[in-house]
Amino acid sequence: MLHIADTTLTSRLLTGTGKFATPELMLAALEASGSQLVTMAMKRVDLNGGNDAILAPLRQLGIKLLPNTSGAKTADEAIFAARLAREALGTHWLKLEIHPDVKYLLPDPIETLKAAEQLVKEGFTVLPYCGADPVLCKRLEEVGCAAVMPLGAPIGSNQGLQTRDFLRIIIEQARVPVIVDAGIGAPSQAADALEMGADAVLVNTAIAVARDPVAMARAFRLAVEAGGLARQAGLGSKQFVASATSPLTGFLHQQAEGAVR
């Protein structure tokens, strides 16, 4: 189970709604993923209700919507978008994204912390996308964020867990869920994040641009389940030297003694 604020989810796979070829393909992939929490950019939402072709089916699937502030370059812009999202979609949940750099889409730590503090005061359940900075993640936790979402690699890059060492520190120190967001490009990488101790992952590009997004969504679902189960079961410790799984010499000694007799 994944516990975020006052909500319990059975799936540890969060998904996005961007880059799919058609809305129908997106909905089919999201259903195959088993995801119960899906993020959507506010800039894609028709505030006049014209986007119900997407929103209504999502709600019918029992999927909780997590609007995000992608496109915001400052704390003020993100706060404005958050207020619009709450009014338009009737949710106080928010994925906070502030990335002024259009080439690498790296999150602005100063503006993110500033916006998070204000939005928490306004009653939002804030899940901030941030760099894999243990100090920043702890500060975001301290101002009241419901989870932290450190990046594995730049958004859409499919590079995997490039920030592995820092993610380990964040996971060790966090008292809120850690959701690895951005850069995960293969189901094996998602499983790796869960085995490492992450509470969940968010995947969009790797599913949306796959040759078969529905099959890829199912692959990620199985990988996340496997990674989480492996972590729960207890992974064996790594060793430099070999450790035999059965006695190496007992059988030979028994045979030698039998031959002498």
Curated annotation (Swiss-Prot):
The active site is at K95 (schiff-base intermediate with dxp). GO terms for biological process: thiamine diphosphate biosynthetic process. Keywords: Cytoplasm, Schiff base, Thiamine biosynthesis, Transferase. It is an enzyme of class 2 (transferase). Its EC number is 2.8.1.10. GO terms for cellular component: cytoplasm. It catalyses: [ThiS sulfur-carrier protein]-C-terminal-Gly-aminoethanethioate + 2-iminoacetate + 1-deoxy-D-xylulose 5-phosphate = [ThiS sulfur-carrier protein]-C-terminal Gly-Gly + 2-[(2R,5Z)-2-carboxy-4-methylthiazol-5(2H)-ylidene]ethyl phosphate + 2 H2O + H(+). Its main location: cytoplasm. Pathway: Cofactor biosynthesis; thiamine diphosphate biosynthesis. Catalyzes the rearrangement of 1-deoxy-D-xylulose 5-phosphate (DXP) to produce the thiazole phosphate moiety of thiamine. Sulfur is provided by the thiocarboxylate moiety of the carrier protein ThiS. In vitro, sulfur can be provided by H(2)S. PANTHER family: THIAZOLE SYNTHASE (PTHR34266:SF2). This is Thiazole synthase. It comes from Pectobacterium carotovorum subsp. carotovorum (strain PC1).
